[in-house]
A protein has these predicted regions:
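Basic/polar N-terminal segments that are highly enriched at the extreme N-terminus
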Residues: 1-3, 25-31, 742-753
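Bacterial N-terminal signal peptides that target proteins for export
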Residues: 2-15
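Ala/Thr-enriched low-complexity intrinsically disordered regions
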Residues: 14-16, 22, 747
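Hydrophobic h-region of N-terminal signal peptides that target proteins for export
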Residues: 18-28, 487
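Beta-strand-centric surfaces of beta-sandwich/beta-rich domains
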Residues: 29-558, 562, 591, 613
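Beta-strand-rich ligand-recognition modules
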Residues: 131-166, 306-332, 336, 447-498, ...
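TerminUS-proximal long segments
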Residues: 175, 198-202, 492, 496-573, ...
């Protein structure tokens, strides 16, 4: 049952969820993690720690590491001629984002908990004659500003509508020509406190209008106003002499949070201000957590406005707006600190900047230090990307002193060419979290990551969470050298990517890491210098000593066998040069059960179990059971289903002659990448208070061939290595930083000139 107030879309269940959330915060208990549409409503909780949440980004990428047909039309398996499966998940979760290339592949099947929902767009009926101003269908379920089609994005159909599922989710394409896409979804440790229970999408209820109204405010001041909830605002004016630095604002003595940071400059100084350096330091840490060129931090590679647009960037957290005389740059990402904050600007060589207006809106921080996190913007310059190696935007193990960090990756702003060369955009995003050797996030291209398709048609666009704000269609059409600077941005809110130990963010440059374009990148992330996911045990299957140590029993397991293969790290050979060689490992496979014992942290909030496996076996599925080894007689409790769809053999279908309506093809492609890491989340009620657990894996085969009528697949459960990670509260209080600042709250601001 739901009740709507006309024109506002508030439901009883929405109000109840917010009351539940507020009550938890008021009681002093750990706050609930915002999920579903609450992730937008509660956007002020962007910095909060997401313990027990995992994000995954799956796609139609070329399994061989290349760029075949621009990473399109590679399917996990084909359930039927009009059911070409690209995503198959078992267990509760939320799909937060999907991206398709135009209408290709539509109608799309969203099979949720056994119910098939058809999603399509207005060009589906006659794809040979696409419809301008197209929309998703059903239109009311996929409205702007949470869904856009190629008419707005210049090449892609995008949806940020949360799609919940309680048991299973399967996505399939009805047509296969140019069927490309990537999808971001979250899984949760059962027992994690959420703002609302996960409920299956019903295919009938539109997103609430309060959320649509909120996201529609992108490009405006969305932060709490001064005077509300203790918010204050300081402002001033400064000059920035060439090659010199100026402190803009400082605050010390008590925990706080910046909710809005704004600069404005005369239009005739905009190009020079692009390269001014913005630095922000939290709690007197030795290095600034934000250290980036000003324009790139605010979402654009350069403050060059070819078409005299009002907005270069009209996103939800960042805005670059022009009026008749000035350029206004605004950031609304929440920025907590626990003792002090300092904002600085560093000038550029050969140019004096003056008449810089600034303002900072800030207020008290009420969250405990280990439940929040610092904002970071890590800048990297890549003038000559190395052939065969991804461009690395971030490795948290090597920033700000290194070590363990816990938080979430929330986006990028990056220049991908200084010469209007769009071909480098064929490169795929690859993101690795918490020691994984398999990317938890693997995309299909760089402009896809930036919300476009087909290089945005060379056009500029700006949306709440993705955009291509600057850059000409080609070097030949560029009006100046500044017009050749190409940049894109992508922000993650509901679809952010948590990590508990480390994050490695990479972009392939060109379709096979061969581009020589000059990249400059900013990776946005929240993080504390302490782990929330700690490695407590590791067990190597096939190693006699490790098997004895972990009480491994598997009556039907194969003898240990050696595998020589690779992980999915892009092309292994480029221009005749081997980029990364194969490696060897040992493991077993079983069609029965395996049992073993693992050590965990008794203060855990749940456990993540990672398995290294041989991905040559299709659709590996097993029941997972957990028992307390300290008990006299094992009492097994079911932890869930561990399912990994697909294998290193995929089905490729790309009808010839660009035939949109061509029949589905069944071309099997097997890659040389058999190694894969996969993850399973064990409910906290089965692990809390225990220092050891016994795990039972029972193989449950999925008798589905790669395509209807195809040969019977090779089925087994592969196990090479198991690693246990325990979720814990980060050991961080903020006190060490607070001791280095005065005990009385004090704010310093730059003097007006």
């Amino acid at each position: 049952m739901s009740l709507e107030r006309s024109g506002r879309g508030w439901h009883i269940k929405t109000i109840a969820a917010l009351v539940w959330f507020a009550a938890g915060c008021a009681s002093g208990a750990s706050p609930a993690i915002p999920v579903g549409l609450d992730a937008y409503r509660m956007w002020g909780r962007w910095p909060m720690q997401r313990l027990g949440v995992r994000a995954y980004m799956r796609s139609t990428y070329d399994r061989t590491g290349g760029n075949e047909t621009a990473d399109a039309s590679h399917f996990l398996y084909q359930f039927a001629p009009d059911r070409n499966v690209t995503l198959d998940v078992e267990g509760p979760g939320i799909l937060y984002f999907v991206r398709y290339n135009h209408w290709h592949g539509s109608p799309w099947h969203y099979e949720i908990d056994g119910t098939d929902h058809i999603v399509q767009e207005t060009s589906t009926a006659d794809p040979l004659h696409p419809v301008e101003n197209s929309t998703f269908l059903p239109r009311d379920l996929f409205p702007k500003p949470l869904a856009f089609t190629w008419s707005d994005t210049k090449g892609a159909d995008l949806s940020w509508i949360p799609i919940g599922f309680e048991k299973t989710f399967r996505m399939a394409y009805s047509r296969t020509f140019y069927g490309t896409g990537y999808y971001i979804y979250h899984r949760f440790v059962d027992g994690t406190k959420l703002s609302r229970p996960i409920q299956s999408w019903d295919g009938r209820t539109p997103p609430s209008s309060d959320v649509l109204d909120l996201i529609s405010k992108a490009g405006t001041d969305i932060a709490p106003a001064a005077g509300q909830s203790g918010m204050r605002q300081n402002h001033g004016k400064l000059a920035l002499p060439r090659s010199q630095s100026r402190v803009v604002w400082t605050r010390s003595g008590s925990p706080g949070i910046i909710r809005a940071l704004e600069f404005s400059i005369p239009r005739d100084q905009a190009l020079a201000f692009s390269r001014a350096r913005l630095r922000m330091t939290w709690d007197d840490r030795p290095q600034p957590s934000i250290d980036a060129p000003a324009s790139l931090f605010f979402g654009a590679g350069i403050l060059y406005n070819r078409d005299n647009r009002e907005y270069l960037v009209k996103s939800f957290p960042m805005v670059i707006r022009y009026d008749a005389t000035r350029v206004h740059l605004s950031c609304y990402l929440p920025m907590p600190f626990f003792g002090s904050a300092r904002i600085e600007l560093a000038g550029v060589p050969d140019v004096d900047l003056d008449d810089i207006d600034w303002s900072v809106r800030f207020g008290p921080l009420k969250d405990p230090a280990n439940e929040s996190s610092y904002l970071h913007a890590t800048y990297r310059d890549h003038p000559q990307p190395e052939v065969g190696k991804d461009v690395e935007l971030l490795d948290t193990r090597n920033v700000e002193g290194g070590g363990d960090w816990s938080g979430q990756f929330i986006g990028t702003s990056f220049i991908f060419s200084h010469d209007a060369d769009l071909r480098t955009l064929e490169g795929d995003p690859r993101f690795f979290f918490d020691d994984s050797q398999t990317p938890q996030a693997q995309g299909t291209g760089t402009e896809e990551w930036g919300g476009g398709g087909d290089y945005w048609g060379g056009l500029n666009m700006t949306l709440p969470f993705a955009g291509h704000p600057v850059g000409a269609r080609s070097a030949q059409e560029a009006k100046s050298a500044e017009d050749r600077v190409e940049s894109a941005y992508r922000f993650l809110l509901a679809d952010l990517m948590p990590f508990g130990k480390n994050a490695v963010i990479r972009l392939e440059h060109g379709g096979t890491n061969e581009s020589t374009q000059h990249y400059e990148t900013v990776a946005y992330w929240y993080g504390l210098p302490a782990a929330s996911l700690i490695k407590t045990d590791e067990f190597s299957v096939g190693d006699d000593g490790s098997e004895r140590q972990h009480n491994y029993v598997s009556p039907d397991a194969s003898p240990p066998y050696e595998i020589e293969s690779r992980y999915e790290w892009g092309p292994d050979t480029i221009q005749g040069m081997e980029v990364f060689p194969a490696s060897k490992d040992r493991g077993r496979s079983t069609k029965g059960t395996s049992e073993f014992r693992l050590q965990i942290d008794p203060k855990n909030l749940g456990v993540m179990l990672r398995r290294k496996l041989d991905y040559s076996f299709l659709n590996q599925r097993a029941e997972v059971w957990v028992a307390d080894p300290a008990a006299g007689k094992a009492s097994w409790r079911k932890a869930g289903i561990w399912y990994l769809a697909g294998s290193n053999t995929c089905v490729y279908s790309f009808p010839p002659n660009r035939n949109e309506l061509g029949a589905t093809e069944h071309v099997l492609q097997t890659s040389n990448r058999r190694f894969r890491d996969d993850e399973f989340l064990i409910p906290s009620e089965l692990t809390r208070g225990r220092s050891k657990i016994r795990v039972r894996i029972r193989f449950t085969p999925v008798e589905t061939p790669l395509y209807p009528g195809g040969p019977a697949p090779s089925l087994a459960w592969s196990e090479i290595r198991y690693t246990a990670y325990s979720y814990v509260h980060p050991r961080f209080s903020g006190r060490d930083s607070a001791r280095r600042v005065v005990s009385t709250s004090k704010t310093n601001i730059a003097p007006s000139d």
